[in-house]
Amino acid sequence: MGSRFLLALFLILLVLGCEVQAAQQLQQDDPGSSALLDKVQESISSYWDTAKAAAQDLYQKTYLTSVDEKLRDMYSKSSAAMTTYASIFTDQILTLLKGE
């Protein structure tokens, strides 16, 4: 599973790198590329809004009170644990830096 994750991460980074390189070439070639960029941003924004609305509709259709309570309880417990561990880690770093 770790190799699949790394492969997926590599492919995502490769695609993003190609997109950035293509965007830079478009800006260098065409001074009116801001209009194209605006169209792409609007398109991505509309796709995102559509996906978000679909996810919210699906959530509302499958909403269960008991599951929601369990999720809230799990979130509060995990955030409390993370706060504790973060403060311990910070204390250890400060102790290491002070040299006590």
Curated annotation (Swiss-Prot):
InterPro entries: Apo-CII, ApoC-II_dom_sf
Residue span of region Lipoprotein lipase cofactor: 78-100
UniProt-recorded name of the protein: Apolipoprotein C-II
Highest taxon of source: Eukaryota
Keyword Secreted in record: yes
One of the protein's GO biological processes: lipid transport
Gene, per the UniProt record: APOC2
Alphabetized GO MF terms: phospholipase activator activity; phospholipase binding
PTM statement from Swiss-Prot or TrEMBL: Proapolipoprotein C-II is synthesized as a sialic acid containing glycoprotein which is subsequently desialylated prior to its proteolytic processing. Proapolipoprotein C-II, the major form found in plasma undergoes proteolytic cleavage of its N-terminal hexapeptide to generate the mature form apolipoprotein C-II, which occurs as the minor form in plasma.
Main location: secreted
Function, as annotated: Component of chylomicrons, very low-density lipoproteins (VLDL), low-density lipoproteins (LDL), and high-density lipoproteins (HDL) in plasma. Plays an important role in lipoprotein metabolism as an activator of lipoprotein lipase.
Signal peptide: 1-22
Homology family: Belongs to the apolipoprotein C2 family.
UniProt region (Lipid binding), positions on chain: 66-74
Disulfide bonds: none
Localization in the cell: Secreted
Keyword Transport listed: yes
A single Gene Ontology CC term: very-low-density lipoprotein particle
Keywords, comma-separated and alphabetical: Chylomicron, HDL, LDL, Lipid degradation, Lipid metabolism, Lipid transport, Secreted, Signal, Transport, VLDL
